[in-house]
Amino acid sequence: MDFTYSEEQQMLADSLRRFVASEYTFEKRRRNAREHGAFDRRIWSALAEMGVLGLGIPAEHGGFGEGPASQVVVQRELGRALVQEPVIPGAVIAGAVLSHYAPAALQSQWLPAIASGERVFALAYLEAATRYRLDAAQASATPSANHGYVIDGVKSTVWHGGAADMYLVSAKLDGALALFLVQRDAPGVSVTPYPTIDRLAGADLALDKTPATLVTADGLAALEFGIDHGIAAQCAAAAGAMERLIEITAEYLGARKQFGKPLASFQALQHRMAEMLMHNELALSMAYVAAQGLDAADPEERRRKVSAAKVITARAARFVGQQAVQLHGGMGMTDELEVGDYFKALTMTDVLLGDTDLHMERYCGAMAA
């Protein structure tokens, strides 16, 4: 598989790397988290100006219409810096769902707002009893004479839900899963944000006869499509984070001395670093496999490639994160080193957008189809 960037992709990667080197140093990332939580409006606007938020949105709606391969380039750079803003749920997932499943009027209304950074979207599909099952939603939607539809239910672990002002919400409509748009300031909306272990944020979303706009009655297909785009982006971001963590670890082993020699000179540690690099390369390869799957005409092929990428990337992320902590010794357990931030982010790779058990089952189902 050829990972060579096109000229435009290389320019985009270079500009993003310069941006995060300036705005996302370890100290600035920690300060932003303290002052702004997991969302800094200034950074969000800058990402919009650089074309990150509109990358996959059609040009007629203010975006650039780039394909999944370009998204891998972008997410790899954002992952290297552990960028905290909700690019994946707010732009990648929401943009994919609205671009392919929303009626033309909703596309014209909301896609330009995503590309410009004017609106921040979040995906509210998980519930306490669903265990990642997309079609097991207990939230329900009913027609309303005044508002089109109203939704009742509670959504949990909404990724970046506290920063969002718009929600894509799954709910049962006439017994089938549908997807709706809900505005944060709509009547009956209650948002309870909380921090997650990776210094990001989740939220619980309670809806009590909340007015909603129908995006599509084919909610299961739309939800799967959007989440698969999010997983491909997540795999690329994890590969970028692993890449940077390996660099940090190599720098530490080169500087730290034991028995009068740098730790990097010990062959056993060199072998462990080589294993970390192999896992990182495998994860990057699988990010491109997932990106290829997004273009597949057959949904089963898409499911197979995306779920395989998710499982392998999650395993690689855990391995690289754990090895980095161990190679840093006792310092790896402290909060003062950025290795801990990378470890936490990589650990979350397994549980975001479906865990390994779910995707192993999904992969096997796609293989049998």
Regions flagged by a language model, labelled:
Residues 1-82, 101-106, 113, 117, ...:
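Alpha-helical interface subdomain recognition
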Residues 53-57, 73-75, 122-124, 168, ...:
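Short, conserved beta-strand segments within well-ordered enzyme catalytic domains
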Residues 66-67, 133-135, 160-164:
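Short glycine/proline-enriched turns and hinge-like loops at secondary-structure junctions
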Residues 117-128:
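A short, Trp-centered hydrophobic/proline-enriched beta-strand micro-motif
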Residues 124, 148, 152-189:
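A short core secondary-structure module
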Residues 132, 136, 157-158, 183-214:
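Flexible, small-/acidic-enriched active-site or ligand-binding loops
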